[in-house]
Amino acid sequence: MSHSVKIYDTCIGCTQCVRACPTDVLEMIPWGGCKAKQIASAPRTEDCVGCKRCESACPTDFLSVRVYLWHETTRSMGLAY
């Protein structure tokens, strides 16, 4: 099952989510929109196991990284039974 990983622009570039991910789904990429000049990116969402460790590691008040499990994604799209 494929999960959706969304990175929000509230990312502060701390790398905590990248280090917490056991399957290397996340990586940091250059971005001038925050103090750290980098932001998390999720180029390998097909490897996401849905553990949400990245969410737990995020230090921002509004989670900058969110994992939507496949059943949550289909429900929000009106595709679940």
Swiss-Prot record:
Quaternary structure and partners: The eukaryotic PSI reaction center is composed of at least 11 subunits.
Organism phylogeny: Eukaryota, Viridiplantae, Streptophyta, Embryophyta, Tracheophyta
Keywords, alphabetical: 4Fe-4S, Chloroplast, Electron transport, Iron, Iron-sulfur, Membrane, Metal-binding, Oxidoreductase, Photosynthesis, Photosystem I, Plastid, Repeat, Thylakoid, Transport
Top-tier EC class: oxidoreductase
Main location, first listed in the record: plastid
Membrane topology: Peripheral membrane protein
GO terms for MF: 4 iron, 4 sulfur cluster binding; electron transfer activity; metal ion binding; oxidoreductase activity
GO cellular component: chloroplast thylakoid membrane; photosystem I
Known cofactor(s): [4Fe-4S] cluster
Catalytic activity line of the entry: reduced [plastocyanin] + hnu + oxidized [2Fe-2S]-[ferredoxin] = oxidized [plastocyanin] + reduced [2Fe-2S]-[ferredoxin]
Cell location: Plastid, Chloroplast thylakoid membrane
Pfam families in alphabetical order: Fer4_21 (PF14697)
Full protein name: Photosystem I iron-sulfur center
InterPro entries with a match to the protein in the record: 4Fe4S_Fe-S-bd, 4Fe4S_Fe_S_CS, PSI_iron-sulfur_center, PSI_PsaC
Residues the record lists as binding [4Fe-4S] cluster 1: 11, 14, 17, 58
